[in-house]
Amino acid sequence: MSSFSFESSARLPLNPRFKQILHATVKSYIDTAEPVGSKMLTQQYNFGLSSATIRNAMAVLESWGLLFQPHTSAGRIPSDSGYRVYVDELISPPTELIQQMRAALAENLGERQDLESLLQGATRLLATLSGCVALITAPQSVFVSVRHLQIVHIGEGRALVIVVTDALQTRSFLLDLPQPEMAEQLETLNNFLNLQLQNRRLDDLNAAAVEAMGGEFHWYTDFLRGLIALLQRVLQPPTGQLYVSGVGEILKQPEFAEPERIQAIVQLLEVERERLGPLISPTQRHSRQIVVRIGAENPLGPMQFCSLVSSTYYLNEVPVGSVGVLGPTRLPYDRAIASVQAASDHLCQVMQAEDEPHRW
């Protein structure tokens, strides 16, 4: 189970007073969605400072680009840079919240299930826990290994192939047997294939690997080559497979009251969701860190008013898929980070769990 950490930007040298006031301003805006003034902070927080002192400090934070006024007469709200400092420097790892969410995931997703049901359930629960749009990518088949394979003769030169992977996938398909006498050798062939294929990644099973298997079944090389090709095809998830849940959550936020923003974000989440996959793809990861992209740090236009919190889940220490939540930049970051960390940990734990293949 991975420890909590997240990528951070270069730190801005803020003294304790500025940190305290920036933290309070961001937290108040996250909670209320209303611009924050010095009077509000004086009433809500026991700073031991006058309203004028707080107002001056907020003006300095604005001059540094961390706060801004949406209207001349309004209070201040955080900029993307202000949120960045808040995430990188002003909040602590939400350890207790992570533990609570891990428990919720284990309780609600505790039963052993197939991969698709697991990911669908995890996505729905992640949306509920975070209050955001939840995104989970399916494991990439190139990282998947065969755990068990069984070929069953069903008559008339046909066989049923059942395969179980270490990513909780179970698939079956029909296959022609090239020679009638092969049906009598299936038990021996099954033992041979399980010995040769077990725990080998599918992308390692190329033509050379099939040739190298050799053994007593060397005259079935063409059959083995066809079998491997079918395995790679049936275990390959659809391109850009991404599970999404909680779209309605983001539409409840005042940031998306404008019809243009609603249309853009719904178009992205419901019609063009394949564009989201690469943003949280495990190929973007170099460590087990939480990644937080805020506002303009996101490359897609509809996400310029959003924050994306994401991480990776692993299978046999290899990153195979990703978990993320998407919401407005006015995001409860501690809760978003905790939910993503907990979901990533849970998927890692389930993927690594040892069990009898036939129970899947």
Curated annotation (Swiss-Prot):
Keywords: Repressor, Stress response, Transcription, Transcription regulation. One of its GO terms (biological process) is negative regulation of DNA-templated transcription. The keyword Secreted does not apply. Coiled coil: none annotated. GO terms for molecular function: DNA binding. Pfam families: HrcA. Disulfide bonds: none annotated. InterPro entries: GAF-like_dom_sf, HrcA, HrcA_C, WH-like_DNA-bd_sf, WH_DNA-bd_sf, WHTH_transcript_rep_HrcA_IDD. The keyword Repressor applies. Belongs to the HrcA family. Negative regulator of class I heat shock genes (grpE-dnaK-dnaJ and groELS operons). Prevents heat-shock induction of these operons. PANTHER family: HEAT-INDUCIBLE TRANSCRIPTION REPRESSOR HRCA. This is Heat-inducible transcription repressor HrcA. It comes from Gloeobacter violaceus (strain ATCC 29082 / PCC 7421).
